[in-house]
Amino acid sequence: MTNIRKTHPLLKIVNNAFIDLPAPSNISSWWNFGSLLGICLILQILTGLFLAMHYTADTTTAFSSVTHICRDVNYGWIIRYMHANGASMFFICLFMHVGRGLYYGSYTYMETWNIGVILLFATMATAFMGYVLPWGQMSFWGATVITNLLSAIPYIGTNLVEWIWGGFSVDKATLTRFFAFHFIFPFIIAALAMVHLLFLHETGSNNPTGISSDADKIPFHPYYTIKDILGALLLILALMILVLFSPDLLGDPDNYTPANPLNTPPHIKPEWYFLFAYAILRSIPNKLGGVLALVLSILILVLMPLLHTSKQRSMMFRPISQCLFWILVADLLTLTWIGGQPVEHPYIIIGQLASIMYFLLILVLMPMASTIENNLLKW
């Protein structure tokens, strides 16, 4: 008799995705981040569910309800900090996952890549709305500043912002709808992640060489199941070290002050994982230009398959492209640092140079390097 996992309609799907899936024999730890993102998402949904049981989405009680969770609810503090720092781990894994895709040319799987970009946007939107919920100073002013960016859209901008706010400023209506959206979005992300996986399994995984691995496949289980479990343990270890030793390391002290529309904090800045985009936004002295640059800084990922001029898929055997890739990483770290600094000399000019460098590297230098590398070899 055939094994039930191969015949049962539901188990068959699980079997083909996680057990008998043929996988390349040489995929490195950079291929662990997909499963880690899945674990992060499940963790966020579970901790978020328990937080939602005690949270109230009302301007008068939101801040107090978060305080209540931390002080009075059994293990509420650990649930709250696991959720807040879980978001940081989520974004670390996301950036690593995208970086892996860029380095090894995984973006040539167009459908998988484009759904990945949509997933990135959806995750960023979810994180932004979640940051508003505790209704601290940075929550309120962050929401005000970021939603206000939409007013830069010609003609419909102002109406659009007021429609999103549900009034003439960020208020009760805004908080309530953000809570509703923050609750539903992770499930949309989970659904999209399944489509992401569906498209990936149409082609199979890429591997570090960028060459077809059809001639040398191994079963996903036990080889990569055990590898994913190791990755998961390391992820949870890192998260728990953060949660139990320095839970407020990545947060903003201003968010421990209740939201006050009459008092603007001296430095409005988002969570660390948005700082690179925030720096790009601020580096352009025009509102609409800044908003366009902000959107394009992420949307540029969609162009990656079109900008691929190399005859090799992966950067593994392309030293010039490797150098430029790591310069891009350093540039993004520079932008992240600048995004957290006040708008004054020398930070303004550093931010502008780093922003120019970001777009220049992706749009001009990397495609040029690929062309040079093609000509260095006999094909």
Swiss-Prot record:
Residues that, per the record, bind heme b b566: 97, 196
GO biological process, one term: mitochondrial electron transport, ubiquinol to cytochrome c
UniProt GO cellular component terms: mitochondrial inner membrane; respiratory chain complex III
Keywords for this protein: Electron transport, Heme, Iron, Membrane, Metal-binding, Mitochondrion, Mitochondrion inner membrane, Respiratory chain, Transmembrane, Transmembrane helix, Transport, Ubiquinone
Cofactor descriptive note: Binds 2 heme b groups non-covalently.
Topology versus the membrane: Multi-pass membrane protein
Residues bound to a ubiquinone: 201
InterPro entries: Cyt_b/b6_C, Cyt_b/b6_C_sf, Cyt_b/b6_N, Cytb/b6-like_sf, Cytochrome_b, Cytochrome_b_C_euk/bac, Cytochrome_b_N_euk/bac, Di-haem_cyt_TM
One Pfam short name: Cytochrome_B
Molecular function GO labels: metal ion binding; ubiquinol-cytochrome-c reductase activity
SUPFAM superfamilies attached to this UniProt entry: a domain/subunit of cytochrome bc1 complex (Ubiquinol-cytochrome c reductase), Transmembrane di-heme cytochromes
Chain residues that bind heme b b562: 83, 182
Transmembrane segments: 33-53, 77-98, 113-133, 178-198, 226-246, 288-308, 320-340, 347-367
Taxonomy, superkingdom: Eukaryota
Annotated compartments: Mitochondrion inner membrane
Cofactor needs: heme b
Subcellular location, principal: mitochondrion
Family assignment from sequence similarity: Belongs to the cytochrome b family.
UniProt function note: Component of the ubiquinol-cytochrome c reductase complex (complex III or cytochrome b-c1 complex) that is part of the mitochondrial respiratory chain. The b-c1 complex mediates electron transfer from ubiquinol to cytochrome c. Contributes to the generation of a proton gradient across the mitochondrial membrane that is then used for ATP synthesis.
Other facts: Heme 1 (or BL or b562) is low-potential and absorbs at about 562 nm, and heme 2 (or BH or b566) is high-potential and absorbs at about 566 nm.
Subunit and partners: The cytochrome bc1 complex contains 11 subunits: 3 respiratory subunits (MT-CYB, CYC1 and UQCRFS1), 2 core proteins (UQCRC1 and UQCRC2) and 6 low-molecular weight proteins (UQCRH/QCR6, UQCRB/QCR7, UQCRQ/QCR8, UQCR10/QCR9, UQCR11/QCR10 and a cleavage product of UQCRFS1). This cytochrome bc1 complex then forms a dimer.
Name listed for the protein in its UniProt record: Cytochrome b
Record gene name: MT-CYB
